[in-house]
Amino acid sequence: MNPEEIRQRRLQEMQAKAQEQGAEDPEAQRQAQEQQMQYEMQKQKILRQILSEDARSRLARIKLAKPQFAEHVEMQLIQLAQAGKLPVPLTDEYFKGLLDRIYEMNRPAKKEITIMRK
């Protein structure tokens, strides 16, 4: 077999696999999307209750810049609010301090390089 035939065969196999996965159960995919939407709506409702307007806008800006960090912050806020450890509504100043603490906890360890000269 020449390399072109091998590439064609692999391409066909990959396309067949993608079609099988896509056509497996569209109903299950639709339900998963619905559940995801429900989850997001509920999360936004809780965040509206616990954050002030300024804090919400700050979180929205963070979400644009660092979506993964914002998701982590949202989960932390929800957990703390459910445990009753947050003042409601959360002011922007308090939120800034909380962001600093969360960032410090999740920041990778700073590596130091020392050069020894002989």
From Swiss-Prot:
Record region (Disordered): 1-35
**Gene Ontology MF terms:** DNA binding
Keyword entries, A-Z = DNA-binding
Bias class Basic and acidic residues marks the residues at 1-12
Coiled-coil regions listed: none
Recorded hits in Gene3D superfamilies, A to Z, give: PDCD5-like (1.10.8.140)
Query: Which Pfam family, any one of them, does this sequence belong to?
Result: dsDNA_bind
Q: Name one GO cellular component term.
A: cytosol
Asked whether the UniProt record includes Nucleotide-binding among its keywords, one would answer no
Q: Which NCBIfam families match?
A: PRK04239.1 (NF003268)
Q: Which family does it belong to?
A: Belongs to the PDCD5 family.
Query: What protein name does the entry list?
Result: DNA-binding protein MmarC5_1518
Organism the protein comes from: Methanococcus maripaludis (strain C5 / ATCC BAA-1333)
User: What are the top taxonomic ranks of the organism?
Assistant: Archaea, Methanobacteriati, Methanobacteriota, Methanomada group, Methanococci
